[in-house]
Amino acid sequence: MEQKKITQGDLVSMFLRSNLQQASFNFERIHGLGFCYDMIPAIKRLYPLKADQVAALKRHLVFFNTTPAVCGPVIAVTAAMEEARANGAAIDDGAINGIKVGLMGPLAGVGDPLVWGTLRPITAALGASLALSGNILGPLLFFFIFNAVRLAMKWYGLQLGFRKGVNIVSDMGGNLLQKLTEGASILGLFVMGVLVTKWTTINVPLVVSQTPGADGATVTMTVQNILDQLCPGLLALGLTLLMVRLLNKKVNPVWLIFALFGLGIIGNALGFLS
């Protein structure tokens, strides 16, 4: 009996389809229909009979939910199991869906902080810093870097998952993902901390004293001068930490934005901010 094999072309097709995984998002099965759509090239390759194709499609219409950028290993391992099943291996529906469930949780645990908590804020911050100066490269930089990394994660995850098959489950159970997540979180916090002083500008021009200088000119000491001597960027850091604390207490971000607008306008009108 000729062995049925998923080709590299099938993997490319599944990779391209995976970018539409959320197009059919719903609150019953989340990405379930999208995952089924991703599997169609493999199913057509492995099951020539229409009845077998229908059964395989139904098998993948169940609930599925993980970070889209890291869904590659799940698609690949599932395809590898379908390939083994099509070639006579004793693999039932429960085993295939069990592997999907076993992978999507750990991958979401690392994918969310990596993609949404680290990659997107860092690339958006870099793009915004250019956009604030009127540079059109700002949004383009964000778009291309974010998507290049996102697509690379998905593609190499797909290749790795298909190459290793179900053995990848043991890797997901180790400390590798936890260490990767912690490292990415530290990097993201470091970059955002550096950008705090660049983005947040607070100036308190209240005059504390005026003294004659050596050249006869008047030397004015303001509250901002004193704060800068103690710790440059102290107010920016304090405001950022306050906002983080309020967000952690579930304060509505929109209200915080309006509050900052109001504080800035009132402070400038009364002369204690500029």
Curated annotation (Swiss-Prot):
It comes from the Bacteria. This is PTS system sorbose-specific EIID component. InterPro entries: GatZ_KbaZ_carbometab (IPR050303), PTS_IID_man (IPR004704). It comes from Klebsiella pneumoniae. Residues 4-273 form the PTS EIID domain. Keywords: Cell inner membrane, Cell membrane, Membrane, Phosphotransferase system, Sugar transport, Transmembrane, Transmembrane helix, Transport. PANTHER family: N-ACETYLGALACTOSAMINE PERMEASE II COMPONENT-RELATED (PTHR32502), N-ACETYLGALACTOSAMINE PERMEASE IID COMPONENT-RELATED (PTHR32502:SF5). PROSITE patterns: PTS_EIID. The phosphoenolpyruvate-dependent sugar phosphotransferase system (PTS), a major carbohydrate active transport system, catalyzes the phosphorylation of incoming sugar substrates concomitant with their translocation across the cell membrane. The enzyme II SorABFM PTS system is involved in sorbose transport. It is found in: Cell inner membrane. The EIID domain, with its homologous EIIC domain, forms the PTS system translocation channel and contains part of its specific substrate-binding site. One of its GO terms (biological process) is phosphoenolpyruvate-dependent sugar phosphotransferase system. It is a multi-pass membrane protein. GO terms for cellular component: plasma membrane. Induction: By L-sorbose. The chain crosses the membrane at residues 61-81, 99-119, 126-146, 186-206, 226-246, 253-273. It holds the Pfam family EIID-AGA.
